[in-house]
């Protein structure tokens, strides 16, 4: 194909998402495996679909950590991180530390509040 890999990856995610309910979970996992790794441009979307496929298979022990990894990614949309944090928690993976780090004031915040 003459399209850049990024567009082909996006097309794959959209196809898997559209066909998710009728696709065997293991096939979803296999198709998205190269994209469902932290640091990959499509990790958020591919990781969420992969984790949901694991939930569908009853493998919550594999889904929870993926949701937790998504929740830790500051470069992903807040809605996806929040949803992933909730899913991880529901699956027994503690993400409170992840949220606490995000809400902790930085050194500049502490300095700014002293002047008020």
What are these regions (language model features)?
Residues 1-106, 114-116:
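Soluble extracytoplasmic domains of inner/organellar membrane proteins
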